[in-house]
């Protein structure tokens, strides 16, 4: 399972989060976001010259192709997450230039999955977030049961209002294209600053529940 922690900003907090068992770390380059990072901390600043092991994701909303490419080059981003109204053609343009892409979709009903069809083959992952007035960051969770309506081939990440108390629901969630989770506001002390203990305990619960509860793992058949 991919674990992505998004909305990072402070170098020390980035170091602490990167030391956890996470796979991706996200930086938001959308100026209207409460977690907007004007200048992404460089790898050296964030990790005291040690390599930042999680993959770096740049989050953009309706940015130009040129500005995304510039940020990707400057900060050595591994993925570009497109969270606005970017077209399949925009994605294909970036894809042809060698960029790995995540396309976010606001979800409220099964009908919302229709729009993912034209992005098949144009991105590496979808990210399903709670539909709201803005571009994510609502802190609200949508009804995961409607994900049975997603029949696409592209793997997806779950986002939107995931909190520490959702660990069991995530452990029990099943879908053939489920690839991981995106964590943000549910684990914050304030916008852009993550609670390390909450993250650590949550990750322990979803990855190693038997260890966390002190129970022996169930035998496999």
Curated annotation (Swiss-Prot):
A Gene Ontology biological process term: L-tryptophan biosynthetic process
UniProt EC number: 5.3.1.24
Metabolic or biological pathway: Amino-acid biosynthesis; L-tryptophan biosynthesis; L-tryptophan from chorismate: step 3/5
A GO MF term: phosphoribosylanthranilate isomerase activity
One Pfam family of this chain: PRAI
Catalytic activity: N-(5-phospho-beta-D-ribosyl)anthranilate = 1-(2-carboxyphenylamino)-1-deoxy-D-ribulose 5-phosphate
Family: Belongs to the TrpF family.
Name of this protein: N-(5'-phosphoribosyl)anthranilate isomerase
Organism name: Parabacteroides distasonis (strain ATCC 8503 / DSM 20701 / CIP 104284 / JCM 5825 / NCTC 11152)
Gene, per the UniProt record: trpF
